[in-house]
UniProtKB/Swiss-Prot annotation:
Glycan-linked positions: 50, 114, 131, 160, 195
Membership in a protein family: Belongs to the protein kinase superfamily. Ser/Thr protein kinase family.
Catalyzed reactions per annotation: L-seryl-[protein] + ATP = O-phospho-L-seryl-[protein] + ADP + H(+); L-threonyl-[protein] + ATP = O-phospho-L-threonyl-[protein] + ADP + H(+)
Gene: WAKL21
Protein's name according to its UniProt entry: Wall-associated receptor kinase-like 21
Segments crossing the lipid bilayer: 248-268
Natural source organism: Arabidopsis thaliana (Mouse-ear cress)
């Protein structure tokens, strides 16, 4: 992504000629702004704007009008620290008010946290991204969607009910963009549609006001253009000139077209209702993601065009892999940075929950062996996540020889196990409340240029109980990947840090054996790798599960370290969680195994460096 000052939210500030679909006799102009009835710059118009002598723009109070449509007015709200909340009163008028939907008011100095929208913009974002260094008060979100049953916000709810002193800015949202510094207003004329002043061939839309009253808007029907209100001219039918159509052909096909039209209308009605439902769901999703993005200043926001360009329009040649929840593509931004972009397969609530969860968790932790979330994108109900690119794929791909590279040496396997354990231990012990990954598996362990491991895919992760509480687990429905799932968690629905320990134990067995976790070509009692490993290790038959690819380099010291790792895996795979070690204990055991195998710390790095160099000389980086 180019280094421009917009990595969090899309800043959209328009200054252009303003027009509306409802026409009237003549128009009024204020330098750069052209308006038509019912909008104007004098008392003779129902909805009056002022004309800025400095910019030549239409303004409402002190706020510039950016756009006027058949139903809305968009105004610019520049981010300002400690702007009095009562400044918003300028946008509550007899014929206009902020829309209840697709709007979020950003406020400061609140006595209590607003419950309607759980989002908070950190001071770091305000200071660094908006260049407002003196803005010390945190910014929170006031979502107008729950304030009233009307179509517009209530001034009393915003000014008095919010308990906030300052109005920082606003956010308006559409299906394809999130706009900071922009507020959407609804407009109307007095009276209900029953007392309409709409012209012939115009439809009336009612507007429910916050005081219980009604307003209305007039719009020319589809196929008509002109003046929707009762002023001279009215709405007239649009005339399209068509050449080369014979009159008799038109008459002959008219009957057929009428029949087809009836069928089309019925089908269109069905799909339109479904589309409305989907559109409403997308709007709800967008509002949720919007708050998450606004509340996580460490997560940049990319546009869909940037994502599309980076992946070459999601070309198959850039596809890195696909899973249950989405497809991952390799991408490259203009600054030549390589990234991995996950495109979710589904747009349902479950998928969105996982996106929100991953944004929250990855933006709150940092560790060299956790994959970094570089940004995200939301376009028309479809979320995308942008990660750092891991050129050597996944641990699973190497253990299953899917990349055409030499088998991983024992030194590399042991190093990957140690790094992965360190990352999980960090999530369990260095974060409060702890984070339980819930999907530790070899395909979620990525490898960088130097084969350092990084854990990915936090969509199923959950926060544990804070260390201030004595509870050892949380109750939740089991989720994860078959073969890696803690059997006791599956039995009693109690998730704890020991659930990740079990999954990591399965990964250790994969590292030793190179076997698939679930393999139906094995005997029935050995389909599950964990069951097979527990049986063989318990009977002292570790040699039965050692990867044949390791036979060429095996020696007494290496054989001893494999046995020690197998015994550690055996403890991790205990059915009862209380019998399993903690991740901190596992990292300590792995450190001892490394020292036994390498002899010294310096020898460890020398051996790894030599192995990595040989691999990189034989096989070019992807």
């Amino acid at each position: 992504m180019a280094e421009t000052p917009q990595p969090y939210l899309i800043f959209v500030f328009f200054v252009f000629t303003l027009t509306v679909a409802t026409q009237t006799t003549g128009s009024v102009k204020c330098k750069t702004s052209l308006l038509r009835y019912p909008f104007g710059f004098s008392d003779g118009y129902p909805i009056r704007f002022n004309c800025s002598e400095i910019t030549g723009e239409a303004v409402i109070g002190e706020f510039a009008v950016q756009e006027v449509t058949n139903s809305n007015i968009y105004v610019e709200i520049p981010p300002v620290c400690k702007r009095n909340i009562r400044k918003i009163e300028q946008l509550f008028r007899e014929n206009l008010a902020p829309s209840k939907l697709q709007n979020i008011i950003l406020v400061q100095g609140c006595k209590k946290q607003n419950k309607s929208s759980n989002c908070l913009i950190r001071n770091k974002f305000v200071e660094n991204r908006l260049n407002l260094s003196k803005c010390k008060s945190p910014v929170s979100c006031l979502d107008g969607a729950t304030t009233t049953t009307a179509d517009v916000m209530s001034l009393g709810d915003v000014v008095n009910g919010s308990g906030c002193k300052y109005w920082f800015s606003s956010i308006s949202q559409s299906q394809v963009s999130v706009n900071l510094g922009r507020l959407k207003l609804d407009w109307w004329l007095k009276g209900s549609c029953s007392n309409t002043t709409c012209s012939e061939n115009a439809d009336c839309a009612k507007v429910k006001l916050d005081d219980g009253g009604l307003g209305h808007r007039c719009t020319c029907r589809e196929g008509f253009s002109g003046k929707a209100f009762t002023v001279p001219g009215g709405c007239h039918r649009l005339v399209y000139k068509r050449k080369g159509l014979h009159k008799l052909v038109v008459l002959g096909t008219a009957g057929i077209l009428v029949g087809v039209l009836v069928i089309v209308v019925l089908i269109a009605t069905y799909f339109f209702r479904n589309k409305q439902s989907a559109s409403s769901e997308r709007a709800s999703i967008a509002n949720r993601l919007l708050c998450e993005l606004a509340g996580n200043s460490s997560v940049p926001f990319y546009t869909y065009k940037e994502i599309e360009k980076a992946t070459d329009s999601f070309s198959d040649k850039n596809m890195l892999g696909t899973g249950a929840y989405g497809t991952v593509y390799a991408g490259e931004f203009p600054n030549s940075s390589c990234v991995a972009i996950k495109r979710l397969k589904h747009k349902d609530t479950t998928s969105i929950d996982q996106v929100v969860n991953e944004i929250k968790l990855l933006s709150s932790v940092s560790h060299p062996n956790l994959v970094r979330l570089l940004g995200c994108c939301f376009a028309d109900g479809e979320p995308f996540l942008v990660y750092e690119f891991m050129p050597n794929g996944t641990l699973y791909q190497h253990l299953q020889h899917e990349r055409g590279q030499p088998p991983l040496s024992w030194q590399l396997r042991l190093a990957i196990a140690c790094q992965t354990a360190n990352a999980i231990a960090h999530l369990h012990s260095s974060v409060n409340p702890p984070i339980y990954h819930r999907d530790i598996k070899s395909s979620n362990i990525l490898l960088d240029h130097e084969f350092n491991s990084k854990i990915s895919d936090f969509g199923l992760s959950r926060l544990g109980m804070s260390t201030d509480f004595e509870a050892s687990h949380i109750s939740t429905a089991p989720q994860g990947t078959p073969g890696y799932l803690d059997p006791q968690y599956h039995q009693d629905f109690q998730l704890s840090d020991k659930s990740d320990v079990y999954s990591f134990g399965v990964v250790l067995v994969e590292i030793i054996s190179g076997f698939k976790v679930i393999d139906f070509t094995r005997p029935y009692s050995e389909v599950n790798l964990a069951s097979l490993a527990v049986d063989r290790i318990g009977r002292g038959r570790v040699v039965d599960i050692i990867d044949p690819c390791l036979n060429k380099e095996i020696n007494p010291k290496m054989f001893a370290s494999i046995h020690n790792l197998a015994e550690l895996a055996f403890r991790c795979l205990s059915f009862h969680r209380n019998m399993r070690p903690t991740m901190v204990e596992i990292t300590e055991d792995l450190h001892r195994i490394k020292l036994m195998h390498y002899g010294t710390e310096s020898g460890k790095f020398k051996n790894r460096s030599e192995i990595d160099m040989k691999r990189q000389q034989s096989f070019p980086r992807e």
